[in-house]
Amino acid sequence: MLKFKKRIMTEEVHLRINDNKGAFYIEVEGKQEAMMTFVFAGEDKVIIDHTEVNPGNEGKGFGKKMVTKAVEFAREKGIKIIPLCPFAKSVFDKTPEFRDVL
């Protein structure tokens, strides 16, 4: 009888900030599979301007995970989010508990 190890893939959201812009991104097995970019608008706001998920990863919840991480980041820093990205805006529209950071 053959035994197979079950492979567990983790989709942890990471944050990268460079000067006045940044990105939340997800790596799977060392490869970036999704990214959501933002820019700082002054000291108290960030503008989410783009969300992208690599082909084959659509529908896995990566986009919502990144928006959720952005909301946590905004709450920790006491800042607001302006979701210009249509995907991010749709998540905010569907998730009333995120609206405190708008």
Predicted regions: what they are:
Residues 1-9:
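Short, Lys/Arg-enriched N-terminal segments with co-localized hydrophobic residues
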Residues 22-33:
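Conserved beta-hairpin
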Residues 36-44:
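A conserved beta-strand-loop-helix scaffold within acyl/acetyltransferase catalytic domains
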Residues 45-54:
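Conserved acetyl-CoA binding element of GNAT-fold acetyltransferases
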Residues 69-102:
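C-terminal structural segments of small proteins and small subunits
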